[in-house]
Amino acid sequence: MMLEYVLFLSAYLFSIGIYGLITSRNMVRALMCLELILNAVNINLVTFSDLFDSRQLKGDIFSIFVIAIAAAEAAIGPAIVSSIYRNRKSIRINQSNLLNK
């Protein structure tokens, strides 16, 4: 019975993240929504790792790997956003066309 609640929470977080990522025009908000998506994936990995095979920690180890990737994204993402803001004076996604030039 607890599995359904955890999966519902994970699906709810994932859908909020996807909705925010699709509708967001601000780069900082898009990064926050990406973090929500990664956290929902981590919840699923840990839940299914515990459910199917609790002796082997493959899902837990992969979840730690995803957390490390999210930490790198949280460190590099704002640096890229601040660099774009310094050059373009805007952090709106639809106004940043750096690859067009």
From Swiss-Prot:
GO BP annotations listed: ATP synthesis coupled electron transport; photosynthesis, light reaction
Molecular function terms from GO: oxidoreductase activity, acting on NAD(P)H, quinone or similar compound as acceptor; quinone binding
Alphabetic keyword roster: Chloroplast, Membrane, NAD, NADP, Plastid, Plastoquinone, Quinone, Thylakoid, Translocase, Transmembrane, Transmembrane helix, Transport
Keyword Transmembrane helix: yes
Subcellular location: Plastid, Chloroplast thylakoid membrane
Transmembrane regions listed in the UniProt entry: 2-22, 32-52, 61-81
Name assigned to this protein: NAD(P)H-quinone oxidoreductase subunit 4L, chloroplastic
Matching HAMAP family: NDH1_NuoK (MF_01456)
NCBIfam families tied to this protein: PRK05715.1-2 (NF004320), PRK05715.1-4 (NF004322)
Catalytic activity, as annotated: a plastoquinone + NADH + (n+1) H(+)(in) = a plastoquinol + NAD(+) + n H(+)(out); a plastoquinone + NADPH + (n+1) H(+)(in) = a plastoquinol + NADP(+) + n H(+)(out)
Keyword Plastid carried by entry: yes
Pfam family, one: Oxidored_q2
Family membership noted in the UniProt record: Belongs to the complex I subunit 4L family.
Record-listed E.C. numbers: 7.1.1.-
Oligomer and partners: NDH is composed of at least 16 different subunits, 5 of which are encoded in the nucleus.
Function noted in UniProt: NDH shuttles electrons from NAD(P)H:plastoquinone, via FMN and iron-sulfur (Fe-S) centers, to quinones in the photosynthetic chain and possibly in a chloroplast respiratory chain. The immediate electron acceptor for the enzyme in this species is believed to be plastoquinone. Couples the redox reaction to proton translocation, and thus conserves the redox energy in a proton gradient.
One GO term describing the cellular component: NADH dehydrogenase complex
InterPro entries in the record: NADH_UbQ_OxRdtase_chain4L/K (IPR001133), NUOK/Mnh_C1-like (IPR039428)
Topology of the protein relative to the lipid bilayer: Multi-pass membrane protein
